[in-house]
């Protein structure tokens, strides 16, 4: 078993050779001879041809996951909720505008009165 380390793989793969075809049937790169060089082909290097669908002779199998993980104990997160009476204080604001008896328009701020009200929330 060969270990394949590649910078583009997130984790290493183990390669197991597989008998897909016999070695005589596996197509490899072949060099085509340039027997009759034409004037346009003389400057070109020797060309390579290969089968359009290459067959792989091995399979990449990811490693087994770590079996040494410890089990996380289950915790009962459902708890009974007891209702408690919590007093809340709310402010009630009464706004009263006092009209003036004279005919002149007097701009004054309205009087405000604040009462404390205590209520219980169940």
From Swiss-Prot:
Ranges for region Disordered: 98-122
Residue pairs linked by disulfide bridges in the UniProt entry: none
Keywords per UniProt: Glycoprotein, Milk protein, Phosphoprotein, Secreted
One GO CC term on file: extracellular space
Residues at the site labelled Cleavage: 58-59
Glycosylation site list: 74, 84, 86, 89, 95, 102, 118
Location, primary (coarse class): secreted
A single GO BP: protein stabilization
Tissue: Mammary gland specific. Secreted in milk.
A Pfam entry, by short name: Casein_kappa
Residues annotated with Phosphothreonine modification: 98
Top-level taxon: Eukaryota
Residues modified as Phosphoserine: 102, 119
Compartments, as annotated in UniProt: Secreted
General function of this protein: Kappa-casein stabilizes micelle formation, preventing casein precipitation in milk.
PANTHER family given in the database record: KAPPA CASEIN, KAPPA-CASEIN
Record-stated family: Belongs to the kappa-casein family.
Protein name: Kappa-casein
Source species of the chain: Odocoileus virginianus virginianus
Name of encoding gene: CSN3
């Amino acid at each position: 078993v060969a270990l394949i380390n590649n910078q583009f793989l997130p984790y290493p793969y183990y390669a197991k050779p597989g008998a897909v075809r016999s070695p005589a049937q596996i197509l490899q790169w072949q060099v085509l001879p340039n027997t009759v060089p034409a004037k346009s082909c003389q400057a070109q290097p020797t060309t390579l041809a290969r089968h359009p669908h290459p067959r792989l002779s091995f399979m990449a199998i990811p490693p087994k996951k770590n079996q040494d993980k410890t089990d996380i104990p289950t915790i009962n997160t459902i708890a009974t909720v007891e209702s408690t009476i919590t007093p809340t204080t709310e402010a009630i604001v009464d706004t009263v505008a006092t009209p003036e008896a004279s005919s002149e328009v007097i701009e004054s701020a309205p009087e405000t009165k604040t009462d404390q009200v205590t209520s219980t929330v169940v």
